[in-house]
C-alpha cells in the first residue's frame, strides 16, 4: 500500500517519519538522525516494541513518559530489529496521506482489484470462514479455544481517530486471508504489483 503511494509520488521513502505522523520520532541517543519511512519498512529505524505497539502513544513523547525506552542503543539505519510498531506507524502514515482508513484502503486498492476475500477488519468478514485459534493452557495441560483473537472491534471502530487508531487493525500482520488468496497476493507482490 505504501509503495502505491510512492509510485504515485504522494510520498517518499526518504521522508522524515516525524513530519508524516505528526509528532517527533527520533532516537534520543541520536537526535539529529532522521528516521525515514524506508527505515520503518526495513526494520532499521532503531525503534523497538518494549513499550508496546497496540498504540502509537508508546512512542509519542507527549503521551508516554517512558517513550525513550522505545528506541534501541544503535543509530537508526545502523542495525536491524523486527518491530511491530514500525508497521503500525506506516499504517498511520497511509491514513494521513490518503484520508482513507487503513483497512478500507487495503480492501479498495489491493484486495478488491485482485478479487481476494480477506481483510484487516474482522467485523466485515464471515466468521464461519475464519479458523478457530486455540492456546495452550499450562494449568489444565490442554488447548483452549481463544475467541478474543478475532473479537469484533466495534467499539474501537466507533471511537476511531484517523492516523492514530490504526494499530487496532494490526498493519503488522493482522490480515485475515485464505492460503490460496495469500498466494495470489504474493504472486502480485513478486511481480512488482502486477498480477496476470
Task: Tell where the protein language model's regions lie, with residue ranges.
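Glycine-centered, phosphate/nucleic-acid-interacting loop/turn motifs that mediate DNA/RNA or nucleotide
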Residues: 9
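Short, glycine/proline-biased beta-turn/loop segments that scaffold the active-site neighborhood
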Residues: 12-28, 113-114
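Short, surface-exposed loop or secondary-structure junction motifs
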Residues: 28-196
Amino acid at each position: 500500500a505504501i509503495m502505491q503511494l510512492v509510485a504515485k509520488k504522494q510520498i517518499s521513502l526518504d521522508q522524515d517519519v516525524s513530519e508524516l505522523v505528526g509528532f517527533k520520532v527520533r532516537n534520543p541517543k541520536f537526535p539529529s538522525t532522521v528516521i525515514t519511512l524506508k527505515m520503518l519498512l526495513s526494520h532499521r529505524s532503531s525503534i523497538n516494541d518494549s513499550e508496546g505497539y497496540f498504540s502509537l502513544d508508546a512512542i509519542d513523547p507527549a503521551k508516554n513518559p517512558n517513550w525513550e525506552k522505545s528506541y534501541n542503543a544503535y543509530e537508526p539505519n545502523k542495525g536491524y530489529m523486527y518491530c511491530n510498531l514500525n508497521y503500525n506507524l506506516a499504517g498511520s502514515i497511509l491514513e494521513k496521506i490518503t484520508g482513507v482508513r487503513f483497512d478500507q484502503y487495503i480492501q479498495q486498492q489491493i484486495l478488491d482489484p485482485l478479487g481476494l476475500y480477506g481483510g484487516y477488519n474482522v467485523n466485515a468478514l464471515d466468521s464461519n470462514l475464519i479458523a478457530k485459534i486455540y492456546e495452550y493452557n499450562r494449568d489444565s495441560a490442554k488447548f483452549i479455544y481463544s475467541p478474543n483473537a478475532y473479537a469484533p472491534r466495534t467499539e474501537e471502530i466507533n471511537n476511531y481517530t484517523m492516523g492514530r487508531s490504526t494499530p487496532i487493525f494490526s498493519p503488522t500482520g493482522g490480515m485475515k486471508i485464505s492460503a490460496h488468496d495469500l498466494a495470489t497476493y504474493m504472486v502480485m507482490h513478486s511481480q512488482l504489483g502486477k498480477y496476470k
